[in-house]
């Protein structure tokens, strides 16, 4: 149907519809749509139908919205308004490629429409179609050459395309149009100058950049950044004398910034240790309160000189009471000689302070206050905790608590020691004690919640967080709204350890949604940053968004999701009623009655929990509806509800795992775990070339990784078991695997691996697993290798020992309950406080308790 021109009355109504849409008065907009469409002459008016659909979409009525917009487009396919509206609808559904097509169709009908061009440019930068973005910004510059956003947008397009010369020409052309007096400081002009300078530095125009920053120095607001840029450029240009003066000035401004000292050392080209120490001594005299010029020499000096400097450093900090002292010195603990000196000094202080209130019994003068001994004991607790001497650490922290039972740091440290020991319940208990001393401290509250989650106390952790969340909603929901990802990743791990895979997957998908929302939130900044001239921050934002899923929170969530989906593929959840029938066949009447009673109680409990959750959901939906009705804000449509029961019973777990894997392969390719997770997925899918790709990439990162060793042997064994592979695939596999195995059979390859890593328990465990995998008759030898605890083993830490004990229980070595018990007792003697090695409670009634107990401590893998 051709475009129908509306008469003046209806035309005014249509303008009011547009105004209502812009002002978010959607109900009024629908009234005006109805007034036009109720007239039989204009009942099929395409543009009005399209606007009605767009308005309905803003009210959350998505299906009706599409129906009206498509109808409007069919009725007036030559209208740029209809195509534009259809593009806006697609954009609201995150179908950006489709939206771009709609905008392009609209521009064919009205090539100079500013609003469509602006909307198109937003989508192009969002999708990183930089070539298309440059063309669109050029059109906008031609149409609106007086608008600053036109120039800036066009320049940014060239900058992102790394055409620095053109970007600088455009920025300079625009800068010359700005009427800013030389002595006036204008923030937006200052940002423009700094952005211009950033482009110059990225183009390696160092001399021009230095001249530029010096020319406009008076008009730049951020004076500190100017000095830092000067120092960086002068160093690169080799103008070392000038650079040294700049870095000295920077140190005068902030004597605690380690980077300034590094720059000063480079500028002065100091070759000897004495010269370096002299520089630090001079700075220390100029800035007597600064810690850094006294701390950095401790990294440089050895032996007796270190003892002398460390003695002075420790005494000053203990006397004034410096809680983060150990954190300041922790980076020195790679050097065993320095650790011994620190230990000797501080233990002597403690002994002397106890007897005579001096650091040394040979001193005179003013006595140290009682708090000095407290901080010395606090330091020693941290020191011995770092060295893995947990009994001593506990002795010192208990002594400190006995003298000052109101200091939060002491209870915090005690909880930390128990965490490192592997007793997570006790750690949570002491962190709760610390939290109770100051309930208004959000940091300690969060730490307490985190420790509770590590101990699988999910409900208690939620209650702890509820002290700082909005009233009227559950803490879990509120933390999700706030994108509190540390809490969610810890919840994922806790649910995973408890076998509540549906709940864990729900949290994984929530984290995935957060990252999607963060990416989507860029839209607000594409126009805002150009308007406010925060161009450096804007370019940094775009670059951050490009690698957003490299973040540790995403990696943790994705890794857990993949592991759970692999587990669900290997052991699909069975129908409970069928499972009960199978179990009941072999039970006596008494046992059957007991089992049925237990099941009824469990069902009743589950039903009550489900009813509570349902009531909570209904209440939240009512609140959301009320909020929408009151505010009449634009709604993006309700998200699909994440139901744990559905998530853990997906039809194809491997396909779901691949969805989480793809961002990791694109952005975290330097992490070996990415490729080993990929191998595990492709191994189950039977994709041999993709398996090969994964192990090759992992091999290039770390050829001696224990998990990779297991994957290589399983892969090679699987290839040899599949004789029906296509010839070309077999040829490629044999050629590539030959490079790794170097003409060795699997047994020899495994033996070499064990010999090479005879002092590493993690490697011995993987080698022993593969020994049993290749030859079941060698069970005893494999277990003997995995359970070695002699003095030559270097990594006898809690994490690794628990890993071995779990391997003895999970079937990696077949049935070996007696060997597990022997190993548990040996580990208990080695680590008496670790929960995983304590004698299992009520073993007769529950033989699997040990497995469940040790499984709770997987969390230590990333903590110790």
Curated annotation (Swiss-Prot):
GO term, biological process aspect, one: positive regulation of DNA-templated transcription
TPR repeat placement: 46-79, 80-113, 148-184, 224-257, 374-407, 409-441, 485-518
Pfam families linked to this entry: NatA_aux_su (PF12569), TPR_2 (PF07719)
Stretches with biased composition (Basic and acidic residues): 606-621
UniProt GO MF annotations: acetyltransferase activator activity; ribosome binding
TM spans (from-to): none
GO cellular component terms, semicolon-separated: cytoplasm; cytosol; extracellular exosome; NatA complex; nucleus; transcription regulator complex
SMART domains (UniProt xref): TPR
Cystine pairings recorded for this chain: none
Keywords noted in UniProt: Repeat, TPR repeat
Disordered: annotated span: 603-638
Record has Secreted as a keyword: no
SUPFAM superfamilies xref list: TPR-like
Subunit structure: Component of the N-terminal acetyltransferase A (NatA) complex composed of NAA10 and NAA16.
UniProt function note: Auxillary subunit of the N-terminal acetyltransferase A (NatA) complex which displays alpha (N-terminal) acetyltransferase activity.
Protein name as catalogued: N-alpha-acetyltransferase 16, NatA auxiliary subunit
Species of provenance: Homo sapiens
């Amino acid at each position: 149907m051709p475009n129908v021109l509306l008469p003046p009355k209806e035309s005014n109504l249509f303008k009011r519809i547009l105004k209502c849409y812009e002002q978010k008065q959607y109900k009024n907009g629908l009234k005006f749509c109805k007034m036009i469409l109720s007239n039989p002459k204009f009942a099929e008016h395409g543009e009005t139908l399209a606007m009605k659909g767009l308005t309905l979409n803003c009210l959350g009525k998505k299906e009706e919205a599409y129906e009206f917009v498509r109808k409007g487009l069919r009725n007036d396919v030559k209208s740029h308004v209809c195509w534009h509206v259809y593009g806006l609808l697609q954009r609201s559904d995150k179908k950006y490629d489709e939206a771009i097509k709609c905008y392009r169709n609209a521009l064919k009908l009205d090539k100079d429409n500013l609003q469509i061009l602006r909307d198109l440019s937003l989508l192009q930068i969002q999708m990183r179609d930089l070539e298309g973005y440059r063309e669109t910004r050029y059109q906008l510059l031609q149409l609106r050459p007086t608008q600053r956003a036109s120039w800036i947008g066009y320049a940014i397009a060239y900058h992102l395309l790394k055409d620095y010369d053109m970007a600088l020409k455009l920025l300079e052309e625009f800068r010359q149009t700005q009427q800013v007096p030389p002595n006036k400081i204008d923030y937006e002009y200052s940002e423009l100058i700094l952005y211009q300078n950033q482009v110059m530095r990225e183009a390696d125009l160092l001399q021009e950049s230095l001249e530029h920053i010096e020319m406009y120095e008076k008009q730049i607001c951020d004076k500190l950044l100017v000095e830092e840029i000067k120092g960086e450029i002068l160093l690169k240009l080799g103008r070392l004398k000038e650079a040294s003066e700049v870095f000295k000035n920077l140190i005068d401004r902030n004597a605690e910034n380690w980077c300034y000292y590094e720059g000063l050392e480079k500028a002065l080209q100091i070759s000897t240790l004495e010269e370096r120490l002299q520089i630090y001594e001079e700075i220390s005299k100029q800035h007597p309160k600064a810690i850094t010029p006294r701390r950095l020499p401790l990294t440089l000096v050895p032996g007796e000189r270190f003892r002398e400097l460390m003695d002075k450093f420790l005494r000053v900090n203990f006397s004034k009471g410096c809680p983060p002292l150990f954190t300041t010195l922790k980076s020195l603990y790679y050097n065993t000689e320095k650790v011994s000196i620190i230990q000797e000094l501080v233990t002597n202080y403690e002994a002397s302070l106890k007897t005579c209130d001096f650091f040394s019994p040979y001193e005179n003068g003013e006595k140290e206050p009682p708090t000095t001994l407290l901080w010395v004991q606090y330091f020693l607790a941290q020191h011995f905790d770092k060295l893995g001497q947990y009994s001593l650490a506990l002795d010192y922290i208990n002594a400190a608590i006995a003298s000052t039972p109101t200091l939060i740091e002491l209870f915090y440290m005690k909880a930390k020691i128990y965490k490192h020991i592997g007793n997570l319940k006790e750690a949570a208990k002491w962190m709760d004690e610390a939290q109770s001393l100051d309930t208004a401290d959000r940091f300690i509250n969060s730490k307490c919640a985190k420790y509770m989650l590590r101990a699988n106390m999910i409900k208690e952790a939620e209650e702890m967080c509820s002290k700082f969340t909005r009233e009227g909603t559950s803490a879990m929901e509120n933390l999700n709204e706030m994108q509190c990802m540390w809490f969610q990743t810890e919840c994922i791990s806790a649910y995973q350890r408890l076998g509540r895979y549906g709940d864990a997957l729900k949290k994984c998908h929530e984290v995935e949604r957060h990252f999607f929302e963060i990416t989507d939130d860029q839209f607000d900044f594409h126009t805002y940053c150009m308007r406010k001239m925060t161009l450096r921050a804007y370019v940094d934002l775009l670059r951050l968004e490009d690698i957003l899923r490299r973040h540790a929170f995403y990696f943790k969530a994705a890794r857990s999701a993949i592991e759970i989906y692999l587990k669900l593929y290997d052991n699909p959840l069975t129908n409970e009623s069928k499972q009960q029938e199978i179990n009941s066949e072999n039970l006596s009447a008494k046992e059957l009655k007991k089992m049925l009673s237990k099941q009824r109680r469990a069902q009743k409990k589950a039903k009550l929990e489900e009813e509570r959750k349902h009531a909570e959901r209904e209440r939240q939906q009512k609140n959301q509806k009320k909020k929408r009705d009151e505010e009449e804000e634009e709604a993006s449509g309700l998200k699909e509800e994440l139901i744990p029961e559905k998530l853990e019973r997906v039809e194809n777990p491997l396909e779901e795992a691949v969805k989480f894997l793809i961002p990791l392969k694109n952005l975290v390719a330097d992490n070996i775990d990415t490729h080993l997770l990929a191998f595990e997925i492709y191994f189950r899918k039977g994709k041999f070339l993709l398996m090969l790709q994964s192990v090759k990439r992992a091999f290039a990162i770390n050829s001696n990784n224990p998990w990779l060793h297991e994957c290589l042997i399983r892969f090679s064994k699987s290839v040899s078991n599949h004789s029906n592979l296509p010839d070309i695939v077999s040829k490629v596999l044999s050629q590539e695997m030959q490079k790794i195995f170097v003409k060795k059979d699997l047994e020899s390859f495994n033996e070499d691996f064990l010999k090479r890593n005879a002092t590493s328990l993690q490697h011995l465990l993987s080698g022993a697993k593969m020994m049993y995998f290749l030859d079941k008759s060698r069970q005893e030898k494999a277990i003997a290798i995995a359970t070695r605890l002699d003095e030559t083993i270097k990594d006898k830490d809690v994490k690794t020992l628990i890993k071995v004990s779990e391997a003895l229980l999970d079937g990696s070595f077949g049935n070996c309950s007696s060997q597990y018990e022997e190993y548990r007792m040996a580990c208990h003697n080695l680590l008496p406080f670790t929960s995983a090695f304590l004698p299992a409670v009520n073993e007769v009634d529950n033989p699997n308790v040990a497995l469940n107990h040790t499984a709770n401590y997987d969390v230590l893998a990333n903590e110790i």
